Structure formats: C-alpha cells, structure tokens
C-alpha cells in the first residue's frame, strides 16, 4: 500500500517503544528507505495504563470488574488509576505533532510509527473527530493510514 502510494518518507518519527520502532524499521526497509532521518520521542508513546500495566484484559476484569475496565478503556476522559485517559494521550501527542511535524508537513513526507491510542489521538486531531466518535474508532495493527496535507487540512487517502 505504501509503496504503491509513492509516499516516500523524508523523516521518520516514532515513539520510544520497541514494537512501534520495529514496525517503522520494517516499513522503511520495504520501501528501500533505511537511511531516512529517524526522530524518537516519548510524546508519541502509547497511552499509560497505570495500575493496569502488565495485565491482560481478562486479568484486569478479574481485579477491577468488567464494567470498570470497559469504562477506562473506552472513555475519552476517564483514566485508570495512575494512568492516562485518551484525552491525556491526545493532550500529549497533538502538541508534539503541532510543534515537530506540522512545520515540516508541507515540504516532507513523514512516517509516524506509534501504538493505537497515540494514533487515535492523532486521528482525532487530523479528522476533527468528536470525543464520542473517537472512543469507537479502532486502529488496525500494522495497517498504514495515509494523509495528504493540502491547503491547511488533512485528507485521508
């Protein structure tokens, strides 16, 4: 998909976590762009799950209850104990995007490799999605999302 789109990357921005790093490296290798400038920043890291960290969904449900875990996972502004809500993630990801990506977007193609909630936060910003809609949005793992920037707005390709 990316190769066919001719979306060659001039800059590669990634989070600090290994899985997204490896995904980005695979993409660059497949596109014959392994020498692309790489910038790592924890602002793109996955949502922090606090006390849920290290638990799978079943373990979290057993400890905190199915309804509570569902609220934490699918609410926009309710965070698990010691963790971040999707709003918190949005409030971390979007300023990074505005400061470090938007200034380059009109002259460069930028690859961003990150986890689902960081990407959902970014999609909310790019597509101006409501809080109610964004909590329903699923980001498929390993499936590229391509946006074209033109005339001050982003269009999903």
Placement of each model-derived feature along the sequence:
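Single conserved hydrophobic/aromatic residue that forms the stacking wall/gate
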Residues: 1-8, 12
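Small-residue (primarily alanine) positions within well-ordered alpha-helices
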Residues: 7-8, 20-24
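Short glycine-rich phosphate-binding loop at a beta-alpha junction
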Residues: 10-16, 109-113
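Catalytic metal-binding/acid-base residues of hydrolase active sites
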Residues: 18, 44, 117
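Active-site-adjacent alpha-helix immediately C-terminal to a catalytic or transition-state-stabilizing loop
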Residues: 21-22, 32-35, 95-154
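Phosphate-handling substructures
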Residues: 27-94, 138, 148
């Amino acid at each position: 998909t990316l190769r066919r789109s001719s979306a060659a990357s001039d800059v590669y921005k990634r989070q600090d976590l290994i899985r997204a790093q490896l995904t980005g490296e695979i993409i660059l290798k497949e596109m014959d762009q392994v020498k692309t400038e790489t910038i790592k920043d924890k602002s793109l890291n996955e949502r922090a799950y606090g006390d849920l960290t290290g638990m799978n969904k079943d373990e979290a449900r057993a400890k905190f209850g199915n309804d509570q875990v569902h609220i934490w996972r699918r609410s926009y502004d309710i965070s698990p104990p010691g963790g971040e809500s999707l709003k918190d993630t949005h409030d971390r990801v979007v300023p990074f995007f505005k400061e470090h990506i938007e200034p380059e977007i009109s002259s460069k193609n930028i690859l961003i490799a990150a986890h689902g909630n960081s990407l959902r936060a970014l999609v909310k910003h790019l597509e101006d999605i409501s809080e109610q809609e964004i909590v329903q949005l699923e980001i498929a793992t390993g499936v590229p999302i391509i946006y074209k920037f033109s005339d001050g707005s982003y269009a999903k390709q």
